[in-house]
Amino acid sequence: MASGKLPWELEEEILCRLPPGSLVRLRSVCKHWNDLYNDKWFIKKSLGFARPQFIILAGFKIYSIGTIGLDVVDPKIEAEKWAFTRITACNGLLFRDFWNQGVTIWNPWLRQVGWIEYKEDKDFRFCGIGYDAGKPEKGYKIFGYFNRFYDTKLKIGHRFAIFECASQAFKFIDSPEWPTLAGRGEYVSLNGNLYWTAYNEDTREHFLGSFDFSTEISMHFCLLPCAKHVSGLQDKLVLTVFKGDRFALLKQSRISSNTEIWVTKDKINSSNNVVWLNLMTLSIPDFPSLFHQLSDISYFIHDMTLILCCDDNQTGVGCIFIARGDLCKKIQINYVSLGFSQCVYLPSLTSVPLEFRSLQV
Protein backbone atom coordinates (compact mmCIF):
# COMPACT_ATOMS: atom_id res chain seq x y z
CA MET A 1 0.00 0.00 0.00
CA ALA A 2 1.40 3.39 -0.97
CA SER A 3 2.31 5.65 1.92
CA GLY A 4 0.08 8.70 2.23
CA LYS A 5 1.34 12.25 2.55
CA LEU A 6 0.03 14.56 5.23
CA PRO A 7 -1.64 17.79 4.13
CA TRP A 8 0.76 20.72 4.42
CA GLU A 9 -1.49 22.49 6.94
CA LEU A 10 -1.31 19.45 9.24
CA GLU A 11 2.48 19.26 8.85
CA GLU A 12 2.78 22.90 9.92
CA GLU A 13 0.51 22.28 12.90
CA ILE A 14 2.71 19.39 14.04
CA LEU A 15 5.98 21.23 13.43
CA CYS A 16 4.97 24.38 15.32
CA ARG A 17 4.42 22.28 18.45
CA LEU A 18 7.99 20.93 18.45
CA PRO A 19 10.68 22.50 20.68
CA PRO A 20 12.86 25.02 18.79
CA GLY A 21 15.91 22.79 19.23
CA SER A 22 14.20 19.96 17.37
CA LEU A 23 13.00 22.33 14.65
CA VAL A 24 16.55 23.57 14.06
CA ARG A 25 17.71 20.02 13.43
CA LEU A 26 14.82 19.37 11.02
CA ARG A 27 15.25 22.42 8.81
CA SER A 28 17.52 20.50 6.40
CA VAL A 29 14.83 17.86 5.66
CA CYS A 30 13.33 19.83 2.79
CA LYS A 31 13.12 23.35 1.39
CA HIS A 32 9.54 23.80 2.55
CA TRP A 33 10.46 23.09 6.16
CA ASN A 34 13.48 25.37 5.94
CA ASP A 35 11.30 28.21 4.60
CA LEU A 36 9.26 28.12 7.80
CA TYR A 37 12.12 29.93 9.55
CA ASN A 38 11.21 33.07 7.59
CA ASP A 39 7.44 32.68 8.03
CA LYS A 40 6.30 35.25 10.62
CA TRP A 41 3.00 33.44 11.20
CA PHE A 42 4.79 30.16 11.91
CA ILE A 43 7.34 31.83 14.21
CA LYS A 44 4.58 33.51 16.21
CA LYS A 45 2.53 30.31 16.47
CA SER A 46 5.50 28.17 17.55
CA LEU A 47 6.29 30.76 20.25
CA GLY A 48 2.83 30.09 21.70
CA PHE A 49 3.81 26.45 22.34
CA ALA A 50 7.26 27.21 23.77
CA ARG A 51 7.95 26.25 27.38
CA PRO A 52 9.54 28.92 29.57
CA GLN A 53 13.02 28.39 30.98
CA PHE A 54 15.39 30.32 33.21
CA ILE A 55 18.45 31.86 31.58
CA ILE A 56 21.09 32.47 34.25
CA LEU A 57 24.25 34.54 33.96
CA ALA A 58 26.71 33.29 36.59
CA GLY A 59 30.34 34.34 36.56
CA PHE A 60 31.39 34.41 32.92
CA LYS A 61 29.00 31.74 31.64
CA ILE A 62 25.32 31.58 30.78
CA TYR A 63 23.19 28.57 31.60
CA SER A 64 19.61 27.58 30.90
CA ILE A 65 17.48 25.60 33.30
CA GLY A 66 15.90 23.48 30.62
CA THR A 67 17.13 21.14 27.93
CA ILE A 68 20.28 22.92 26.73
CA GLY A 69 23.48 24.30 28.22
CA LEU A 70 24.68 27.66 26.99
CA ASP A 71 28.20 29.00 26.80
CA VAL A 72 29.64 32.49 26.84
CA VAL A 73 27.61 34.93 24.72
CA ASP A 74 30.40 35.94 22.39
CA PRO A 75 33.65 33.95 22.52
CA LYS A 76 35.51 36.90 21.00
CA ILE A 77 34.78 39.15 24.00
CA GLU A 78 37.19 38.90 26.93
CA ALA A 79 34.82 38.13 29.79
CA GLU A 80 37.10 39.36 32.57
CA LYS A 81 36.68 42.93 31.32
CA TRP A 82 32.92 42.90 31.92
CA ALA A 83 32.29 42.78 35.64
CA PHE A 84 28.79 44.31 35.65
CA THR A 85 26.37 42.69 33.22
CA ARG A 86 22.67 41.88 33.04
CA ILE A 87 20.54 39.67 30.87
CA THR A 88 16.95 40.22 29.72
CA ALA A 89 14.54 38.95 27.06
CA CYS A 90 12.43 40.74 24.46
CA ASN A 91 10.43 39.39 21.52
CA GLY A 92 12.03 35.94 21.60
CA LEU A 93 15.61 37.25 21.75
CA LEU A 94 18.08 37.56 24.61
CA PHE A 95 19.90 40.82 25.33
CA ARG A 96 22.97 40.96 27.55
CA ASP A 97 24.03 44.38 28.79
CA PHE A 98 27.76 44.96 29.09
CA TRP A 99 27.93 47.90 31.46
CA ASN A 100 28.94 51.17 29.72
CA GLN A 101 29.99 49.34 26.55
CA GLY A 102 27.04 47.91 24.65
CA VAL A 103 24.61 45.03 24.34
CA THR A 104 24.75 41.60 22.73
CA ILE A 105 21.61 40.39 20.97
CA TRP A 106 21.33 36.64 20.82
CA ASN A 107 19.23 33.63 19.84
CA PRO A 108 20.95 30.52 21.24
CA TRP A 109 18.67 28.12 19.35
CA LEU A 110 19.58 29.58 15.97
CA ARG A 111 23.16 30.12 17.15
CA GLN A 112 23.09 33.78 16.11
CA VAL A 113 24.81 36.61 17.98
CA GLY A 114 24.98 40.34 17.31
CA TRP A 115 26.73 43.25 19.01
CA ILE A 116 25.34 46.75 19.62
CA GLU A 117 28.01 49.21 20.76
CA TYR A 118 27.64 52.57 22.50
CA LYS A 119 30.11 54.43 20.31
CA GLU A 120 29.58 57.98 21.52
CA ASP A 121 28.77 58.33 25.23
CA LYS A 122 29.60 55.17 27.17
CA ASP A 123 28.32 56.45 30.52
CA PHE A 124 24.88 54.99 29.74
CA ARG A 125 22.88 52.98 32.28
CA PHE A 126 20.82 50.21 30.67
CA CYS A 127 17.24 49.81 31.95
CA GLY A 128 15.45 47.75 29.33
CA ILE A 129 14.75 47.19 25.67
CA GLY A 130 11.73 47.53 23.40
CA TYR A 131 10.59 48.57 19.94
CA ASP A 132 7.97 50.57 18.05
CA ALA A 133 5.07 48.09 17.84
CA GLY A 134 3.39 50.17 15.13
CA LYS A 135 6.09 49.43 12.56
CA PRO A 136 6.29 46.16 10.58
CA GLU A 137 9.99 45.65 11.33
CA LYS A 138 11.25 45.60 14.90
CA GLY A 139 13.57 48.58 15.30
CA TYR A 140 15.03 47.79 18.72
CA LYS A 141 15.64 50.65 21.12
CA ILE A 142 17.32 50.67 24.52
CA PHE A 143 15.84 52.78 27.31
CA GLY A 144 18.21 54.07 29.99
CA TYR A 145 19.74 57.13 31.55
CA PHE A 146 22.91 59.10 32.18
CA ASN A 147 23.93 60.35 35.61
CA ARG A 148 24.27 64.12 35.55
CA PHE A 149 25.55 66.59 38.17
CA TYR A 150 23.27 69.58 38.16
CA ASP A 151 24.22 71.97 40.93
CA THR A 152 27.23 73.12 42.90
CA LYS A 153 26.50 70.57 45.64
CA LEU A 154 27.15 67.81 43.10
CA LYS A 155 23.65 66.35 43.37
CA ILE A 156 23.19 63.52 40.88
CA GLY A 157 20.15 63.52 38.60
CA HIS A 158 19.11 61.34 35.69
CA ARG A 159 18.98 62.37 32.04
CA PHE A 160 16.82 59.81 30.27
CA ALA A 161 17.67 58.66 26.77
CA ILE A 162 16.92 56.12 24.08
CA PHE A 163 19.68 54.38 22.18
CA GLU A 164 18.36 53.62 18.69
CA CYS A 165 20.11 50.42 17.67
CA ALA A 166 19.68 50.89 13.91
CA SER A 167 21.28 54.35 13.82
CA GLN A 168 23.56 53.69 16.83
CA ALA A 169 22.69 57.12 18.18
CA PHE A 170 21.34 58.45 21.47
CA LYS A 171 18.17 60.50 21.68
CA PHE A 172 17.49 62.37 24.91
CA ILE A 173 13.98 62.23 26.35
CA ASP A 174 12.83 65.17 28.44
CA SER A 175 9.67 64.82 30.50
CA PRO A 176 8.34 67.01 33.34
CA GLU A 177 7.54 63.98 35.46
CA TRP A 178 9.08 60.52 35.46
CA PRO A 179 7.90 57.52 37.50
CA THR A 180 10.36 56.14 40.01
CA LEU A 181 13.04 54.02 38.37
CA ALA A 182 12.91 50.28 38.98
CA GLY A 183 15.70 48.31 40.56
CA ARG A 184 18.20 46.04 38.86
CA GLY A 185 16.57 43.49 36.57
CA GLU A 186 13.01 44.71 37.23
CA TYR A 187 12.02 46.01 33.77
CA VAL A 188 9.63 43.88 31.70
CA SER A 189 9.09 44.15 27.95
CA LEU A 190 5.66 43.39 26.46
CA ASN A 191 4.34 44.27 22.99
CA GLY A 192 7.34 46.54 22.45
CA ASN A 193 6.74 48.67 25.55
CA LEU A 194 8.65 48.66 28.82
CA TYR A 195 6.97 48.28 32.24
CA TRP A 196 8.14 48.37 35.86
CA THR A 197 6.70 48.56 39.37
CA ALA A 198 6.98 51.87 41.22
CA TYR A 199 5.83 53.52 44.45
CA ASN A 200 4.36 56.99 45.00
CA GLU A 201 5.66 58.40 48.29
CA ASP A 202 2.88 61.02 48.48
CA THR A 203 -0.14 58.77 47.88
CA ARG A 204 1.52 55.58 49.23
CA GLU A 205 0.28 53.71 46.17
CA HIS A 206 2.05 51.07 44.10
CA PHE A 207 1.65 51.42 40.34
CA LEU A 208 3.05 50.32 37.01
CA GLY A 209 5.25 52.77 35.18
CA SER A 210 5.57 52.34 31.43
CA PHE A 211 7.52 53.66 28.48
CA ASP A 212 5.99 53.57 25.00
CA PHE A 213 8.74 53.39 22.37
CA SER A 214 6.36 54.43 19.56
CA THR A 215 5.38 57.74 21.20
CA GLU A 216 8.51 58.02 23.39
CA ILE A 217 6.30 58.91 26.35
CA SER A 218 6.57 57.66 29.93
CA MET A 219 3.41 57.35 32.00
CA HIS A 220 1.74 55.88 35.07
CA PHE A 221 0.10 52.87 33.43
CA CYS A 222 -2.15 51.47 36.19
CA LEU A 223 -2.44 50.94 39.93
CA LEU A 224 -1.34 47.64 41.44
CA PRO A 225 -3.44 45.47 43.79
CA CYS A 226 -1.57 46.51 46.93
CA ALA A 227 -2.58 48.03 50.25
CA LYS A 228 -1.18 51.43 51.11
CA HIS A 229 1.92 51.24 53.31
CA VAL A 230 4.26 53.86 54.66
CA SER A 231 7.72 53.99 53.14
CA GLY A 232 9.85 51.10 54.39
CA LEU A 233 6.93 48.69 54.82
CA GLN A 234 6.03 48.26 51.15
CA ASP A 235 5.33 44.82 49.74
CA LYS A 236 7.95 43.10 47.60
CA LEU A 237 6.68 43.16 44.01
CA VAL A 238 7.99 41.20 41.02
CA LEU A 239 6.38 41.66 37.60
CA THR A 240 6.48 39.14 34.75
CA VAL A 241 4.66 38.32 31.52
CA PHE A 242 1.78 35.83 31.84
CA LYS A 243 0.46 33.74 28.91
CA GLY A 244 2.39 35.89 26.45
CA ASP A 245 0.05 38.88 26.51
CA ARG A 246 -0.82 39.57 30.16
CA PHE A 247 0.99 40.41 33.38
CA ALA A 248 1.50 38.43 36.55
CA LEU A 249 2.48 40.17 39.77
CA LEU A 250 4.13 38.36 42.66
CA LYS A 251 3.43 40.21 45.89
CA GLN A 252 5.11 39.26 49.17
CA SER A 253 4.03 41.03 52.35
CA ARG A 254 6.77 42.44 54.55
CA ILE A 255 4.39 42.18 57.52
CA SER A 256 2.85 38.69 57.15
CA SER A 257 5.35 37.09 54.70
CA ASN A 258 2.41 35.66 52.73
CA THR A 259 2.94 35.54 48.98
CA GLU A 260 0.19 36.26 46.46
CA ILE A 261 0.12 35.92 42.68
CA TRP A 262 -2.11 38.34 40.82
CA VAL A 263 -2.76 38.30 37.05
CA THR A 264 -4.42 40.74 34.68
CA LYS A 265 -7.86 39.66 33.48
CA ASP A 266 -7.41 40.82 29.90
CA LYS A 267 -4.63 41.25 27.36
CA ILE A 268 -2.42 44.28 27.89
CA ASN A 269 -2.91 47.04 25.34
CA SER A 270 -2.72 50.82 25.30
CA SER A 271 -5.66 51.14 27.72
CA ASN A 272 -4.81 51.65 31.38
CA ASN A 273 -8.16 50.18 32.47
CA VAL A 274 -6.55 47.08 33.98
CA VAL A 275 -8.38 44.54 36.16
CA TRP A 276 -6.28 42.34 38.47
CA LEU A 277 -7.40 38.88 39.65
CA ASN A 278 -5.94 36.90 42.54
CA LEU A 279 -4.62 33.63 41.10
CA MET A 280 -3.12 32.05 44.21
CA THR A 281 -2.03 32.75 47.78
CA LEU A 282 0.90 30.92 49.35
CA SER A 283 1.48 30.67 53.08
CA ILE A 284 4.37 28.21 53.24
CA PRO A 285 7.02 28.30 56.00
CA ASP A 286 9.73 27.05 53.63
CA PHE A 287 9.02 29.64 50.94
CA PRO A 288 11.95 32.09 50.60
CA SER A 289 11.86 35.70 51.70
CA LEU A 290 12.32 37.90 48.63
CA PHE A 291 13.44 40.97 50.56
CA HIS A 292 17.16 41.85 50.43
CA GLN A 293 17.91 39.41 47.60
CA LEU A 294 21.33 40.08 46.04
CA SER A 295 20.46 38.36 42.76
CA ASP A 296 17.67 38.92 40.27
CA ILE A 297 14.31 37.29 40.93
CA SER A 298 12.33 35.66 38.14
CA TYR A 299 9.43 33.26 37.91
CA PHE A 300 6.72 31.83 35.70
CA ILE A 301 3.42 30.06 36.30
CA HIS A 302 2.53 26.69 34.81
CA ASP A 303 -0.63 24.73 35.58
CA MET A 304 -1.36 26.70 38.78
CA THR A 305 2.20 26.09 39.97
CA LEU A 306 4.72 28.84 40.74
CA ILE A 307 8.28 28.17 39.54
CA LEU A 308 10.62 30.74 41.09
CA CYS A 309 14.37 31.31 40.78
CA CYS A 310 16.21 33.33 43.44
CA ASP A 311 18.84 33.15 46.20
CA ASP A 312 18.44 30.68 49.05
CA ASN A 313 18.04 32.73 52.25
CA GLN A 314 20.42 30.56 54.29
CA THR A 315 23.22 29.78 51.84
CA GLY A 316 22.94 32.47 49.15
CA VAL A 317 23.14 29.76 46.49
CA GLY A 318 20.82 30.00 43.50
CA CYS A 319 17.76 27.77 43.82
CA ILE A 320 14.56 26.88 41.99
CA PHE A 321 11.47 26.84 44.21
CA ILE A 322 8.37 24.98 42.98
CA ALA A 323 5.28 25.93 45.00
CA ARG A 324 1.66 24.86 44.79
CA GLY A 325 -0.97 24.95 47.50
CA ASP A 326 0.78 24.29 50.80
CA LEU A 327 3.75 22.46 49.26
CA CYS A 328 7.15 23.86 48.26
CA LYS A 329 10.11 22.00 46.76
CA LYS A 330 13.61 23.50 46.62
CA ILE A 331 16.18 22.52 43.98
CA GLN A 332 19.71 23.88 44.34
CA ILE A 333 21.51 25.06 41.19
CA ASN A 334 25.15 24.01 41.24
CA TYR A 335 27.82 26.64 40.56
CA VAL A 336 25.36 29.55 40.87
CA SER A 337 25.83 31.80 43.91
CA LEU A 338 25.21 35.36 45.09
CA GLY A 339 24.74 38.17 42.61
CA PHE A 340 23.69 36.29 39.49
CA SER A 341 21.54 37.87 36.78
CA GLN A 342 18.70 35.95 35.19
CA CYS A 343 15.46 36.14 33.23
CA VAL A 344 12.62 33.96 32.00
CA TYR A 345 12.98 33.17 28.31
CA LEU A 346 10.67 31.56 25.76
CA PRO A 347 12.81 29.75 23.15
CA SER A 348 11.91 31.06 19.71
CA LEU A 349 12.81 31.04 16.03
CA THR A 350 13.15 34.84 15.91
CA SER A 351 16.31 35.75 14.00
CA VAL A 352 18.85 38.30 15.13
CA PRO A 353 18.53 41.24 12.69
CA LEU A 354 21.16 41.07 9.96
CA GLU A 355 22.51 44.56 10.71
CA PHE A 356 23.65 43.39 14.16
CA ARG A 357 24.67 39.83 13.40
CA SER A 358 28.38 39.40 14.03
CA LEU A 359 28.88 35.66 14.05
CA GLN A 360 27.37 32.21 14.33
CA VAL A 361 28.26 30.35 17.56
Swiss-Prot record:
| Segments forming domain F-box | 1-46
Query: Domain of life, per the record?
Result: Eukaryota
Family annotation (CDD domains): F-box_AtFBW1-like (cd22157)
Name used for this protein in its record: Putative F-box protein At3g18340
